[in-house]
Curated annotation (Swiss-Prot):
It comes from Salinispora tropica (strain ATCC BAA-916 / DSM 44818 / JCM 13857 / NBRC 105044 / CNB-440). InterPro entries: PyrdxlP-dep_Trfase (IPR015424), PyrdxlP-dep_Trfase_major (IPR015421), PyrdxlP-dep_Trfase_small (IPR015422), Ser_HO-MeTrfase (IPR001085), Ser_HO-MeTrfase-like (IPR049943), Ser_HO-MeTrfase_PLP_BS (IPR019798), SHMT-like_dom (IPR039429). The lineage of its organism: Bacteria, Bacillati, Actinomycetota, Actinomycetes, Micromonosporales. Its cofactor is pyridoxal 5'-phosphate. Belongs to the SHMT family. The record marks H272 as: Plays an important role in substrate specificity. This is Serine hydroxymethyltransferase. One of its GO terms (biological process) is tetrahydrofolate interconversion. It catalyses: (6R)-5,10-methylene-5,6,7,8-tetrahydrofolate + glycine + H2O = (6S)-5,6,7,8-tetrahydrofolate + L-serine. The gene is glyA. One of its GO terms (molecular function) is glycine hydroxymethyltransferase activity. Pfam families: SHMT (PF00464). The modification N6-(pyridoxal phosphate)lysine is found at K273. One of its GO terms (cellular component) is cytosol.
């Protein structure tokens, strides 16, 4: 697409939107300005291509399409069938998976589809066979009650939150924690690395239905072959949530034992983050679970979002291009440059570095909480997010860590030299930030003190760093 075409498309769109609700158009313009001027280091964020973004803004939004390709509950879905089939084809080819389901609206929806597919395969189907019933509607009230009780009495083993796991992996505040009896595995307290022997021991003791791999804040590769062996040893279904690192799998930065697709029974992902697509989810699996996953609607989902599936098809097609392999490699190289730069300047990193797209800074060495550090960095034009670290003394709200990631800045074209310079900016801000005090004189976990001159200086340096790497350079909104 030419630059003139992109600018014309977005100017026209904002003109149409602004004629109805100018405040929305102004917010869209302001968001582009903010993203252009900030060092975006949130590991779960990226920049989708103009083609991907434009694919979401069309009349597919008007169409209901409950069901699956060729088997809809509504007439007139032939064009939705086209884009869903294309998105699924690209996902299968990109990841080397026998089956792909691209309807989930988000990562948690993808996880819920996977959870219930496993429950349907492992618990519901045997119960139907025992009752000589073809469908749950054919069960007696007594059999249905017994099945519901059995479905709600299953176990899941996943990574603990403070070790880098995700809320949707069976933790009580999330619906997954109300579905499963969950137990966590953690990391070695000295190295911060996954303790695979500890995982095996926990699996033997707990005997989970699902062993769940994947993370949102673990800065190292995971050996999925070992986890599959552990799952097999206790008869568990091995599930992997690769939402954070799917782009590294697609781009062949993770291969062999570190590629989850050949090893897991079922894999879930988002389509944004390192995949650089629209906000959405997908599920990959083999033929043994495909029929159950294909029942995502009505099992978990209602109508899909056809406009987002169209954008998924575009983004997944982009990820199949040869240059995406280079992109994935540069994400990792940039993350390692950022981590090395931080450590050379005295920052403490969980696990002492990174193998993937993110690093986790222990900010207690600066005398700060994660919340204080996050806001001080934001004041200085550096966007991060606070994150718990293993055995975090400040809990999940204030935290003791800052998570930084490189997918977005890599998309903009920054390289290892710029990421080393970014490490200097981060260190400067954190070194000049101090805890604030509460009204009663006690030390605050939220308030902080940062000289505005330091924030302004670093903010200008961050802006200068980005000058040579414009975001959406072809788009001029005037």
């Amino acid at each position: 697409m030419s630059g003139n075409a992109e600018s014309t498309a977005y100017r026209s769109a904002l003109e149409v939107i602004g004629a109805v609700e100018p405040r929305v158009a102004n917010a869209i313009r302001a968001e582009l300005t903010d993203q252009r001027e900030s060092l975006k280091l949130i590991a779960s964020e990226n920049y989708a291509s103009p083609a991907t973004l434009l694919a979401m803004g069309n009349w597919f939004s008007d169409k209901y399409a409950e069901g699956t390709v060729g088997r809809r509950f509504y007439a007139g879905c032939q064009n939705v069938d086209t884009v869903e089939a294309l998105a699924a084809e690209h996902a299968r080819e990109l990841f080397g998976a026998p089956y792909a389901y691209v309807q989930p609206h988000s990562g948690i929806d993808a996880n819920l589809v996977a959870f219930w597919a496993v429950l349907a395969d492992r618990i519901e189907s045997p119960a139907l066979r025992r009752a000589q019933a073809r469908h749950v509607n054919d069960l007696t009230e007594a059999d249905w009650f017994a099945l519901r009780r059995e479905l709600g009495n299953q176990r899941m083993l996943g990574m603990s939150l403070d070790a880098g796991g995700h809320l949707t992996h069976g933790f009580r505040p999330n619906i997954s924690g109300k579905m499963f009896d969950q137990r966590s595995y953690g990391t070695d307290p000295e190295t911060g690395l996954i303790d695979y022997d500890g995982v095996a021991e926990a699996a033997r003791e707990f005997k989970p239905l699902i062993l769940l791999g994947g993370y949102s804040a673990y800065p190292r590769k995971v050996n999925f072959r070992i986890l599959r062996e552990i799952a097999d040893s206790v008869g568990a279904t091995f599930m992997v949530d690769m939402a954070h690192f799917a782009g590294l799998v697609a781009g062949k930065a993770f291969t062999g034992d570190f590629d989850p697709v050949p090893h897991a029974h079922i894999v879930t992902s988002t389509t944004h983050k390192s995949l650089r697509g629209p906000r959405g989810g997908l599920v990959l699996c083999g033929p043994e679970l495909a029929e159950q996953v294909d029942r995502g609607c009505p099992m978990v989902l209602g109508g899909p979002l056809p406009q987002v599936m169209a954008a998924k098809a575009v983004a997944l097609a982009e990820a199949r291009r040869p240059d995406f392999v280079d992109y994935a490699g540069r994400i990792v190289a940039n993350a390692q440059a950022l981590a090395d730069g931080l450590q050379r300047r005295g920052a403490q990193l969980v696990t002492g570095g990174t193998d993937n797209h993110l690093a986790l800074i222990d900010v207690t060495g600066y005398g700060l909480t994660g919340r204080q550090a996050e806001h001080a960095l934001l004041d200085s034009g550096i966007v991060t997010n606070r994150n718990a670290i293993p055995q975090d003394p400040n809990g999940a709200w204030y935290t003791s860590g800052i998570r930084v990631g490189t997918p977005a800045l890599t998309t903009r074209g920054l390289g290892t030299a710029e990421l080393d310079a970014t490490a200097e900016l981060i260190h400067t801000v954190l070194s000049h930030t101090a805890p604030g005090t509460n009204a009663d004189g006690t030390s605050s976990k939220a308030k902080y003190v940062l000289d505005p001159a330091v924030a302004d200086r670093v903010g200008k340096q961050a802006s200068d760093l980005l000058t040579g790497f414009p975001l959406y350079p072809a788009i001029d909104l005037g």
